[in-house]
Regions:
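Secondary-structure junction/capping motif
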Residues: 46-53, 70, 165, 225-234, ...
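Histidine-bearing beta->alpha loop at or near hydrolase active sites
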Residues: 65-70, 186
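Short, flexible loop segments at the rims of nucleotide/cofactor-binding pockets, characterized by
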Residues: 10-12, 67-69, 108, 140-141
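Charge-rich interaction segments
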Residues: 190-194, 201-253
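Serine-esterase "nucleophile elbow" of acetyl-processing enzymes
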Residues: 2-67, 77-86, 258-261, 267-282, ...
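Short beta-strands within extracellular/lumenal beta-sheet-rich domains
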Residues: 240-261, 274-280, 307-310, 357-358
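Generic detector of low-complexity/intrinsically disordered segments
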Residues: 179, 221, 230, 248, ...
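Alpha-helical cap/lid subdomain in secreted, periplasmic
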Residues: 53-57, 73-212, 272-282, 287-367
Length: 368
């Protein structure tokens, strides 16, 4: 993969933005936008809210973001959305999240592979993509860069994509704004400055020149004979789950779940609670786990959350299934599960109340 130019061109904040209202009053050349990102894209009065304000038709901005997740969650949201607008530009905003997952021992190869799949799916559907690269406060105030970001930059360069870089925008047009005012906390930008609005305007302007990911050579070969599927359990009756962001079926984790799958297991999606068991995946080819399906029980925290588990690594390739795959809860006694970033583990009491969450589905790579 060729080296990236680490200085992508950021839209000027002077004449181009002064012309913003004039250019967009009629909506001419302004595409529909689908935002797929992390918690910064969900903040009230954050950059994604401002994007709806500056777009000439706010109804053409769809926000599919989920906090504390990675491109794997973006794939779930994209693949299961039944109401995508025509000919959208997909705004990918998972760099900050994935940098944090990388810092908590999630391999870059896993994160980048899922991001490549995200770009591959967009390319197959003819969707244009505009990455929006955000940074933690600790990164903005440091000369050192998280290693994951080098891999991400090379990935975007290989696909011919030019990201909007929030750090470059800050240094170019908001150099007067100290880091402590730019951020509300380490992973979240403040909504009390003009920066979110400026970022939104830059994203809107660059969305007009966004391109479909270009995959040639090795990238084309890498995915040419593969497809990606969301696989749901085919045993037991699901329970409905609805909140302000998501409506789906979930399958409680207290007993075995069966999946009809011939392929490779990459990840799973679940509604996690404070009382879920550890879970294991197994087929006739092997086993993965156990993994904690719990979230933190801290006071004031959420009771249930949409989460994902990333189920492979370079040293431990995806579990292969040849028709049948099972998820099984593990006994509480003696179980010390793997606890991934943003998850938690507190051993369950025997005979205790069952969890209120459940599995949604699996992310699997299959042969086309």
């Amino acid at each position: 993969v060729k080296a990236i130019d680490n200085q992508p061109k950021i839209a000027s904040m002077d004449i181009s933005l002064l012309q913003h209202d004039e250019e967009t009053a009629s909506g001419s050349g302004t595409p529909s936008l689908v935002v797929v990102g992390g918690s910064n894209s969900l903040l009230k009065n954050g950059w994604a809210d401002k994007l709806k304000e500056v777009h000439p038709d706010s109804g053409r901005v769809l926000n599919l973001s989920i906090g504390a997740a990675t491109s794997a969650m973006g794939l779930y949201r994209l693949l299961t959305c039944a109401s995508l607008p025509d000919d959208p530009v997909i705004i990918w905003e998972y760099a900050l999240n994935e940098a944090n997952y990388f810092s908590h021992r999630q391999p870059a190869k896993v994160l980048i592979h899922h991001t490549q799949w995200f770009l591959e799916i967009c390319a197959r559907r003819g969707f244009r993509v505009l990455p929006v690269v955000l940074y933690n406060k600790s990164e903005a105030g440091s000369a050192e860069q998280v290693k994951y970001r080098e891999f991400l930059a090379r990935t975007f360069a290989a696909y011919g994509l030019k990201p909007v870089d929030a750090s470059q925008l800050w240094r170019k047009d908001f150099g007067h704004l100290p880091v402590d005012r730019l951020y509300a906390d380490n992973p979240h930008y403040s909504v009390e400055t003009e920066f979110p609005l400026a970022l939104a305007r830059t994203v809107l302007q660059q969305s007009r020149s966004a391109t479909v990911p270009q995959r040639g050579g090795d990238l084309e070969k890498q995915f040419s004979d593969k497809d990606l599927r969301i696989v749901f359990p085919d045993s037991r009756t699901p329970e409905p789950f609805v909140n302000r962001i998501l409506s789906c079926d979930i399958f409680p984790l207290g007993t075995d779940l069966h999946f009809s799958l011939s392929g490779r297991l990459l990840a799973c999606f679940l509604i996690a609670s404070r009382m879920e068991p550890a879970i294991t995946f197994h087929s006739d080819r092997g086993q993965k786990g156990p993994y904690s399906a719990q979230i933190s029980a801290k006071a004031g925290g959420p009771v249930r959350q949409l989460k994902h588990l990333l189920l492979w690594s370079p040293q431990d390739p995806p579990l292969v299934a040849r028709g049948d795959l099972f998820l099984s809860p593990q006994p509480s006694l003696g179980t010390t599960p793997m606890v991934q970033h943003t998850m938690a583990w507190n051993p369950l009491e025997e005979g205790g109340a069952p969890g209120s969450g459940g599995l949604i589905g699996l992310l699997a790579e299959v042969d086309a």
